[in-house]
């Protein structure tokens, strides 16, 4: 054990699973906010790898201010068209000029790298989007603030662990409640295995879960793709198929009563339905920004403590807004996996600018235990796990750079 400031205490509330009302949301991959998150993070990973390959380590950068301005479209059964393209602006800071100690200079085309990474992400994630006509991607990356670059830069030999770039915090929790798990898995299924054999379902899928006592109510907003929907009957059939699929998935995770609603704003008589040309509402009136959607664990959970930091696009080496949100979630999951008798657990990590990121100002763990288990029975084991996770924080950075960790 080290002398890290790790606190373990009882959480002064019941487990979220016992709340009378629980609300959980997930914005799917094609939601405008998630598009921005995904582009920002893919650009982040690409820049980090490029720096590592060119100069041997990651330089100062952030791409967490990416914005999306919605376009205009005219969807129609059998196939419509985009009238005005979506506009995406990748915004941030990135080191484009680096001089090594021996005087070797590196000029890094950061905007070109970012542009190609953004287009690559769109190509892989939104297959119904024509990159030549349906979207404009722009990049504006300035140089970083000098004082933050100094915090980022290693000393002569380089510290074993980077210094925190900010005084900030991250929050994580575990285990997921039944409602949280269902909401997460429903979107992932609709944008994964289900979409593979049902091209009519677009990537813009939002899932809102509400649990009142033992009744889980799910509302799905699913953009359907007009080229694969020939008429209203086909549209209605697709909506019903989605409802049945999500219902079956939900009942695999719970014995509670489940109700599923899909595209509740539809008016079949007037023809007002959720039909798109590209599979995303970004084609028509729905703007997006990094950090307005899912938190680091992929969910929006108002029953839980949450950080308002945008995790996607932040530098994975020393940006606390990214590292501590991912690490606190990882710590919570590790504790629940290894320690018996825990019903609910919350982790809060607070940094102090200039201090090593493996030495938080405080690592606070709050626990709800099962009947028959006291916090005193498990606090030493929890502290050991937290200490080990903090000690290996640089491995988390590597996993993020290599695309092994999701941020939204």
From Swiss-Prot:
Matching InterPro entries: AdoMet_synthase_2_family, AdoMet_synthase_3, S-AdoMet_synthetase_arc
Class of this enzyme: transferase
Official protein name in the record: S-adenosylmethionine synthase
Metabolic or biological pathway, per its Swiss-Prot or TrEMBL entry: Amino-acid biosynthesis; S-adenosyl-L-methionine biosynthesis; S-adenosyl-L-methionine from L-methionine: step 1/1
Keywords annotated in UniProt: ATP-binding, Magnesium, Nucleotide-binding, One-carbon metabolism, Transferase
Cofactor(s) for this UniProt protein: Mg(2+)
Gene Ontology biological process terms from the UniProt entry: one-carbon metabolic process; S-adenosylmethionine biosynthetic process
Binding sites annotated in the UniProt record for ATP: 142-147
UniProt EC number: 2.5.1.6
Function: Catalyzes the formation of S-adenosylmethionine from methionine and ATP.
MF terms in GO: ATP binding; magnesium ion binding; methionine adenosyltransferase activity
Database matches in NCBIfam families: PRK04439.1-3 (NF003364), PRK04439.1-5 (NF003366)
Family: Belongs to the AdoMet synthase 2 family.
Residues that span the membrane, as ranges: none
Gene3D superfamilies tied to this protein: 3.30.300.10, S-adenosylmethionine synthetase, C-terminal domain
Catalyzed reaction equations: L-methionine + ATP + H2O = S-adenosyl-L-methionine + phosphate + diphosphate
Name of encoding gene: mat
Entry-linked Pfam families: AdoMet_Synthase (PF01941)
Domain of life: Archaea
């Amino acid at each position: 054990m080290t002398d890290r400031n790790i606190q373990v205490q009882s959480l002064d509330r019941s487990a979220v699973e016992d709340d009378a009302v629980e609300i959980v949301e997930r914005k799917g991959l094609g939601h405008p906010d998630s598009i921005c998150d995904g582009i920002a993070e893919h650009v982040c990973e690409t820049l980090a790898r490029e720096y590592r390959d060119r100069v041997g380590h990651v330089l100062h950068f952030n791409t967490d201010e990416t914005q999306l301005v919605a376009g205009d479209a005219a969807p129609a059964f059998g196939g419509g068209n985009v009238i005005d393209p979506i506009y995406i602006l990748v915004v941030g800071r990135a080191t484009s000029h680096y001089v090594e100690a021996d005087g070797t200079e590196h000029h890094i085309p950061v905007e070109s790298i970012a542009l190609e990474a953004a287009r690559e992400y769109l190509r892989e994630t939104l297959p119904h989007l024509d990159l030549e006509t349906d979207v404009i991607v722009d990049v504006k990356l300035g140089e970083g603030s000098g004082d933050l670059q100094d915090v980022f830069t290693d000393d002569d030999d380089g510290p074993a662990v980077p210094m925190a770039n900010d005084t900030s915090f991250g929050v994580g929790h575990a285990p997921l409640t039944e409602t949280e798990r269902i909401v997460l898995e429903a979107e992932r299924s609709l944008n994964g295995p289900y979409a593979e054999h049902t091209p009519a379902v677009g990537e813009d899928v939002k899932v809102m879960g509400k649990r009142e006592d033992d009744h889980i109510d799910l509302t799905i907003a699913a953009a359907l793709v007009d080229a694969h929907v020939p008429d209203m009957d086909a549209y209605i059939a697709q909506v019903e198929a989605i409802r049945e699929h999500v219902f079956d998935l939900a009942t695999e995770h719970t014995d509670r009563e489940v109700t599923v609603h899909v595209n509740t704003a539809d008016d079949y008589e007037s023809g007002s339905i959720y039909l798109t040309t590209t599979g995303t509402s970004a084609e028509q009136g729905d703007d997006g920004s990094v950090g307005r959607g899912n938190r680091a664990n992929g969910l929006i959970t108002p029953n839980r403590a949450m950080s308002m930091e945008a995790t996607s696009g932040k530098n994975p080496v020393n940006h606390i807004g990214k590292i501590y949100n991912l690490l606190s979630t990882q710590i919570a999951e590790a504790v629940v996996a290894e320690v018996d008798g825990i019903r609910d657990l919350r982790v809060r990590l607070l940094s102090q600018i200039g201090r090593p990121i493996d030495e938080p100002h405080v690592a606070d763990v709050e626990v709800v235990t099962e009947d028959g288990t006291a916090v005193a029975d498990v606090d030493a084991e929890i502290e050991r796990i937290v200490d080990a996770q903090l000690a290996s924080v640089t491995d988390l950075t590597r996993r993020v750079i290599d695309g092994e960790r999701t941020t939204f």
